[in-house]
From Swiss-Prot:
GO terms for cellular component: mitochondrion. It comes from Mus musculus (Mouse). Pathway: Protein modification; protein lipoylation via exogenous pathway; protein N(6)-(lipoyl)lysine from lipoate: step 2/2. GO terms for biological process: protein modification process. Its EC number is 2.3.1.200, 2.3.1.-. This is Lipoyl amidotransferase LIPT1, mitochondrial. CDD domains: LplA (cd16443). GO terms for molecular function: lipoyltransferase activity; N-acyltransferase activity. It comes from the Eukaryota.
């Protein structure tokens, strides 16, 4: 049963003293089940961290249920250029987010359920949570063959991944979050999580591709609503908490003081891209020239999402040496992103007005460079 939250007392009991009073109408004594009314990935990720930072979880575990509009969420230590097809995502309006926990890249949409289990650090147990999900699935469909793995995934029929795991462990609090594939767009999932970019070298955490399947493909009655209700019921029974699913708005600043600041941080270029571990780009591409093609070499060091060193080498007869050197020096310090490259290109073109032949080469070159961003 879903009930809307009226939060004026409960968080007063759950929150640490540094947080202004805000909370639920009926204070829980053992724990809570929450469900977000937002489909915004940044708001939901921010709410996770708000709970982690502000709620006293001793004896009061929390289950948070949430879904997002199409988005890709990468782990804290990942490289988005290695993990995603950023060009496709920009075209399709698929958001990119970097979470505070580790692990690999995942695709979210309204057919993918996200489950976050909040506990104290001492009560943190990923396998227990996964077994709880398995019991919930078997309660609605006893014929399902779903098993947890040593890597804390859930496999359907011993081969199809339906859930992946990540976690964050703090000084006293911890959370384990995982996905549950119900009716996600598997075409969008596959294409979004397939990087087309070549020549990137990095020590960032790589994702491990897996064969996936939707639970709805196995049984048409296993809708997101059915699965969320089943997990909530099993969680309530296991933890002996109130089975009501409390609806919350994670963007409500009056209810969750400081949440908007967390949302803005997660949306920022500095967090999403700037937190990428240092990497290099070492690649070549070809440009048309008379009846043939010329090879252009590109080498860049990228740190904190910005170009630290740049060496673009083109044949002198195609691009004059001094122009190439100007391009290299102009890139240093700029963001490794297509928007900034476009702005930089326009600025540089104004330094040599009227040279249409050079302009066309410059456009071709910068378009190729944007293609690796």
């Amino acid at each position: 049963m879903l009930i809307p939250l009226s939060m004026k007392n409960c968080f007063r009991l759950l929150c640490q003293h540094k947080v202004p009073a805000a909370g639920f109408k009926s204070p829980p004594t053992h724990g809570l089940i929450l469900q977000s009314i937002s489909n915004d990935v940044y708001e939901n990720l921010a709410f996770e961290d708000w709970i982690h930072d502000h709620i006293h979880l001793e004896g009061k575990p929390i289950l948070f249920l949430w879904r997002n509009s199409p988005s890709v969420v990468i782990g804290r230590h990942q490289n988005p250029w290695q993990e995603c097809n950023l060009h496709l995502m920009r075209q399709e309006g698929i958001k990119l987010a970097r979470r505070k926990s580790g692990g690999g890249a995942v695709y979210h949409d309204m057919g993918n359920i996200n489950l976050t289990f909040f506990t104290t650090k001492t009560k943190y147990d990923r396998m227990e949570n996964l077994k709880l999900i398995v019991r919930a699935l078997n309660a609605v469909q006893p014929q399902l063959d779903v098993q947890p793995t040593k890597k804390f995934d859930l496999l359907l029929d011993g081969q199809f991944k339906i859930s992946g795991t990540a976690s964050k462990i703090g000084r006293t609090a911890a959370y384990h979050h995982c996905t549950l594939l119900c009716s996600t767009n598997r075409t969008a999932l596959s294409s979004s999580l397939k990087s087309p970019y070549c020549g990137i070298k990095s020590n960032a955490t790589p994702s491990i591709p897996s064969a996936v399947k939707n639970l709805l493909e196995r049984d048409s009655t296993l809708t997101c609503e059915v699965l969320m209700s089943a997990v909530a019921a099993e969680y309530a029974a296991h933890h002996q908490v109130d089975g009501h699913v409390n609806l919350i708005n994670p963007a409500d600043e009056t209810m969750f003081p400081g949440i908007n600041r967390k949302v803005k941080e997660l949306q920022s270029w500095e967090w999403v891209y700037g937190r990428t571990p240092k990497f290099t780009v070492d690649t070549t591409f070809h440009v048309p020239y008379e009846q043939a093609h010329l090879e252009i070499q590109v080498f860049m060091d990228v740190k904190n999402g910005r170009i630290e060193t740049c060496a673009i080498k083109a044949p002198d007869h195609w691009l004059p040496l001094e122009i190439g050197e100007k391009l290299n020096s102009s890139f240093i310090g700029s963001k490794f992103c297509p928007v900034e490259t476009t702005l930089l290109t326009n600025v540089l073109l104004r330094t040599c007005p009227g040279d249409h032949h050079l302009h066309s080469k410059w456009y071709i070159l910068c378009e190729k460079i944007r293609g690796i961003m």
